A protein has these predicted regions:
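ABC-family nucleotide-binding domains
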Residues: 14, 20-21, 256, 262-263
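Helical segment within the ABC ATPase nucleotide-binding domain
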Residues: 25-38, 267-280
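H-loop/switch region of ABC-family ATPase nucleotide-binding domains
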Residues: 45-47, 287-289
Length: 310
């Protein structure tokens, strides 16, 4: 509406579905079509063809910065060829899912008066869809130990969570490359940031850091250990963050909108990083507004809104 009042002729919307609910997206679609009929133009940038096709009158597929094909609303949907990379990965995920440890008895439980109670078991991937885009922001401070819930608690193996320094729980924030890396620390120091509970004196031990470098050089790349964090690529930053949490070895990992603003190949890589936790038996709770991508790994889907489950 600000764009309408300002008299703009072109409005660019990027990854809108990652921070508004399905109901809000449907309302937005109606608003866009209303003003499109009045002469305004909209450029809708999305990671998913199906999402863009539902809203837009014309859809373009891009690869390596180039448009490879355009579709009008009346055109037949593209062949799976255009999405072969994600389909191949989906098959890979299904094969790996069959080999994963099956969820056992519930080990992590969240209970709170007036909030959705949930539990997650070893090796399980639980996807929580926030239907009104309110629950995630309210739960994250509680899950990370920054705030205490007045009428609830988190139980891990029957023991309450012990505050934000409790390494039994890990929270991977939304857009973690902007909030979970420390540019004033070296690559190895960033990697060891949550390892102090497992290795005594890790900060002053050159021997431990040398051992970690040797062990993870093949996985992360030898060159990254000598680079400033700010010079890492997007992929290398995600590798660093997820490997740090992997080394932390928490009882449960909460991921907030893990695929937000990630292009297709990076989303596939993030799925592989999440799968490492699951293969190790570490449960993963994906907290998202949009279900795209998340369901490929999900054992269960929990749809929540303020006041309880749906």
């Amino acid at each position: 509406l600000k764009a309408v009042v300002a008299g703009n002729h072109l409005v660019v919307l990027e990854d809108i579905s990652t921070f508004i609910s399905d109901a809000e997206l449907e309302q937005l679609s109606g608003i866009l079509h209303h003003y499109a009929k009045k002469g305004m133009s909209f450029l809708y940038i999305a990671a998913h063809f199906e999402e863009a096709r539902q809203i837009c009158g014309r859809t373009a597929l891009m690869l390596n910065g180039q448009i490879i094909k355009c579709f009008q609303a009346k055109d037949k949907a593209p062949d799976p060829f255009f999405l072969h990379c994600t389909e191949d990965f989906d098959r890979h995920v299904r094969e790996q899912m069959n080999q994963r440890p099956r969820p056992e008895e519930n080990q992590i439980v969240f209970q709170a008066e007036g909030e959705p109670a949930f539990s997650v078991a070893r090796g399980e991937c639980l996807v929580m869809q926030d239907l009104d885009n309110c629950m995630i922001q309210e739960l994250i401070p509680v899950l990370s130990g920054e705030e205490r819930h007045s009428a609830g608690q988190i139980l891990i193996d029957g023991t309450p969570l012990g505050g934000k320094n409790d390494r039994r729980i890990a929270v991977i924030q939304e857009l973690p490359v902007h909030s979970m890396l420390f540019s004033n620390l070296s690559y190895l120091d960033n990697l060891c940031f949550t390892l102090d509970h497992r290795v005594r004196g890790v900060w002053g031990s050159k021997r431990v850091k040398k051992s970690l470098r040797q062990e993870y050089a093949e996985l992360l790349g030898e060159e990254v250990f000598d680079l400033p964090v700010d010079r890492l690529t997007e992929w290398q930053k995600y590798d660093l963050i997820y490997t740090r949490i992997y080394l932390q070895n928490p009882k449960v990992v909460f991921c907030v909108q893990p695929f937000k603003s990630a292009e297709v190949s990076l989303r596939i890589h993030i799925m592989e990083l999440l799968e490492r936790f699951l293969n190790k038996g570490i449960p993963v709770v994906i907290m998202a507004v949009n279900l795209a991508d998340s369901l490929a790994l999900a054992d269960r889907l929990l749809r929540v809104r303020r006041g309880g489950k749906v």
